[in-house]
UniProtKB/Swiss-Prot annotation:
InterPro entries the record matches: Metalloenz_LuxS/M16 (IPR011249), MPP/UQCRC_Complex (IPR050361), Pept_M16_N (IPR011765), Peptidase_M16_C (IPR007863)
Gene Ontology annotations for the cellular component aspect, listed alphabetically: mitochondrial matrix; mitochondrion; phagocytic vesicle
Extent of the transit peptide: 1-13
Species per Swiss-Prot/TrEMBL record: Dictyostelium discoideum
TM stretches of this protein: none
Molecular-function GO terms, alphabetical: metal ion binding
Record protein name field: Mitochondrial-processing peptidase subunit alpha-2
Amino acid sequence: MIGRFIARNYTTSIFQESKRIVESTTLSNGLKVVSLVGGYTGPAVSLGLYIKTGSRNETQETAGLNQVLKGLAFESNTNKLGIEVQRDIEVSGSTAFAQASRDNLLIALQTLPNRSLQMLNNLANITKPTLPYHEVRDVTEIIVKESEAYNHDSYSSIFESVHQTAFRGKTLGRPLVAPICNLGNITKDAVTNWVNSTYKPSNMILVGVGLSHNELIEEAEKVTFGNDESSTSISNETAQYIGGESLKYSSGNSKVVLAFEGTAQSNIKDVAAFSVLQSILGNGCPKTAPGHGRTSRLFSLTKNNSNIVNSEAFNLTYGDSGLFGVVAEVEGATVGKTVSLITSEIVAASKTAGQELERAKAVTKSSVLEQAESRTSALEFIGKQAIYTDKVLTPAEFAEEISKVTSEDIKRVAKKMTSKKPTLVVVGDVSDAPTIESVQSQLKL
């Protein structure tokens, strides 16, 4: 009898993966609804609300308000007290998080299908905060501590400098984490004005993974998101890449970043090409496991140069611009030598073809599809596209775009990015740091 029971369970546990499909609809109130269905085992739903606001939209006076909104995400609103919001999420067995970036704010939940309407209500309620004084005060105090920790992280600090230098302190160059001195000046009125300017249906994208599109629309139409009667709006200046250099003396190993303007998220063809170029360069970490970039150019570079502790290519995309480059940690007064080696690898990578190109494309596709196995990662993947473009690709469709990348595409994007002034940031021993002009002279493609 036990044997028959076990056999019966095995015969009913086979899962046939279905094709993943993205659908998008804009409701009458301006709210954009995007869904990804198919291809996931287990009964779970991920819901996310993207708000088109980030540190790039802040000013000198409003710096830090985006962080405050993130901190207030699960606090009191017009329907529930903060403790009720948090308990509601916990009791339902759901998980939630909020994250602020340079050009968007994401509030997300993962729950069971039978709780989806309840959690969707919670998402909608978040966009109608009551902002009691003590909550604004407490959240601001927490953010001050987060800012202190962020500023003490060497890699976070250097990427702040990269953005600030590349965009000359405007738009994407504004600090992701506001200066601590500014956070102490934030008032409830300032937060209220920011809420009224950002929490509007036309400024939001609702993303669902694991819930049918029609069901998501039906449930979204039952609730109210934000204030669609607000006439206020935030500034939305177009990002202008400028480039330049920033040198800061510090003891210990030196950190070097050589960056260029990348591509905007909306340019899918170039996003695919830059993603492959990133895989060609890869990373140079002594602990890199087989199959995780040990054939990349930067791995070989780091392995063959004892002064380079580690190195890694990065590719950051935003709504209207991006940053592509290499970050490295080096020992001694070898910054100049390291930058020359990096420029040589970039020039060589621009000429990649044949087996090396195919291997880089395979690595890139594997990374994209592996990340998509997580509902939350898939939500972020399609949500970020939905903010900036009407055409949203599934992970598999983006993998197809990667397959189409040719050696000419790699050469084209590499030539395009190196045609503008690079951004060079050095923190450490700056005694032999090269000039921007000398770096440019080495980038002849």
